[in-house]
């Protein structure tokens, strides 16, 4: 029994002292953060009006110095992903192209709260969201070398 205790003590001692501590380099936390806005566009290759939605989304992104991020959620075509229809259902998408701006709820003409909105509203609500204060931030340090990326 004493030998087992000695073996356990030696094993735990080796494991404990052989670990190398990794020192994380975390810079100072900034006093303020840059507000970013996410626009998620419901679209499809089959949709005749969707190129206009893509054009409006691109204009909104370009007009806001990289503070608006656009994502196209395809439905009913070869670029669709499994969760697009789920998101459309949860956020009450009623047409194409339409989209969500930071997934905020806004009132429609009848006073109903909707998250998915017409492409004509994206710019207005993106500017409104950009005017709000960002209470937290996210920093990602990345490096790309050839075909490898480190995050």
Question: What is each of the regions a protein language model found here?
Answer:
Residues 44-49, 56, 75-80, 103-108, ...:
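Solvent-exposed loop/turn segments at secondary-structure junctions
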Residues 28-68:
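Local sequence-structure signature of Cys/Sec-based thiol-disulfide redox active-site neighborhoods
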Residues 93-135:
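Non-catalytic, surface beta->alpha helical segment in thiol-disulfide oxidoreductase systems
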Residues 65-84:
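Thiol-based oxidoreductase modules, predominantly thioredoxin-like and allied folds used
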Residues 2, 15-38:
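Bacterial Sec-dependent N-terminal signal peptides
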């Amino acid at each position: 029994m004493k030998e087992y205790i000695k073996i356990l003590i030696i094993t735990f001692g080796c494991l404990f002292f052989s670990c190398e501590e990794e020192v994380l380099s975390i810079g100072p936390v900034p006093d303020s953060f840059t507000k970013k806005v996410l626009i998620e566009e419901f679209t499809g290759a089959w949709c005749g009006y969707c190129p206009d939605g893509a054009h409006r989304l691109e204009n909104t992104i370009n007009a806001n110095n990289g503070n608006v991020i656009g994502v196209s959620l395809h439905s009913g075509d070869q670029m669709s992903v499994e969760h697009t229809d789920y998101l459309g259902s949860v956020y009450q998408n009623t047409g194409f192209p339409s989209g969500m701006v930071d997934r905020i709820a806004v009132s429609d003409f009848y006073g109903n709260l909707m998250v998915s909105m017409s492409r004509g509203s994206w710019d207005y609500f993106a500017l409104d969201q950009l005017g709000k204060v960002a209470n937290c931030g996210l920093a990602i340090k990345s490096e790309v070398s050839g075909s490898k990326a480190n995050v």
